[in-house]
């Protein structure tokens, strides 16, 4: 019985392990790292001011671009219509605390103008997630 237990506890080495990639993406021993998952939801601003709404949404998209370029935002995208009024998600990397994340979120015009609100959750996922970003900029035909 003791031998079976020690075999089950043995870690299997990855023959494809690349230390430089693991370091580049700040992976732990399991190829994972901590992120913040932000769920964007409909905010309290019900204004019909189309100019303010358009300006806020343009600022929202510009802010997404800036945060991606700064290496903080890894994933951003809208959600389909749902009963919880969830509008989209963000996944952030390299942000030290929820307080610092909330300061970053406060730079988003749609959040600042209360068209969007948010919920924040710590998330543990693949450290390779940011690796898709260079490809994503090469496959779109129309800029949002």
Give residue spans per PLM region.
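N-terminal signal peptide c-region/cleavage motif recognized by signal peptidases
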Residues: 3-5
